[in-house]
């Protein structure tokens, strides 16, 4: 997917706008990352199921929602990628808070940098 070209079509930096633009494009059958509207809801359910002092809580999610937080991607390994208006979060499937990777980039800019190998993640696959 050409994220740089996609960026030119986005009217704003909202994660929901980004997700809708991605979903309007053809998806690869064997992609390492799955974009979906349902992933956010699944993420919240997993937060409830795995609730502990060390994991992401519903309260954390509610706080992030104030900044338009939305989970937009799940990897083949079950890890998540989410964004707010100004940050991108790479969240392990374990949901451990201490393992979350935070990047001060909007989702589209994160994907451009990731595709160009300008970002290193211990959680995500090395290549899209």
Predicted ranges, named:
Residues 74, 79-80, 84-106:
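Short, compact, well-ordered microdomains
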Residues 93-125:
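Compact, glycine/acidic-enriched structural inserts
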Residues 1-80, 124-127:
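A surface-exposed partner-binding patch
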């Amino acid at each position: 997917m050409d994220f740089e070209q996609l960026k030119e079509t986005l009217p704003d930096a909202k994660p929901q706008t980004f997700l809708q633009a991605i979903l309007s494009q053809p998806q690869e059958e064997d992609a390492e990352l799955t974009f979906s509207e349902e992933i956010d809801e699944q993420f919240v359910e997993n937060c409830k199921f795995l609730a502990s002092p060390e994991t992401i809580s519903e309260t954390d999610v509610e706080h992030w929602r104030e900044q338009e937080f939305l989970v937009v991607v799940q990897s083949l390994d079950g890890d998540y990628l989410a964004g707010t208006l100004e940050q991108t979060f790479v969240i392990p499937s374990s949901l451990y808070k201490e393992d979350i990777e935070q990047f001060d980039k909007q989702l589209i800019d994160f994907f451009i940098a990731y595709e160009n190998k300008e970002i290193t993640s211990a959680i995500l696959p090395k290549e899209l």
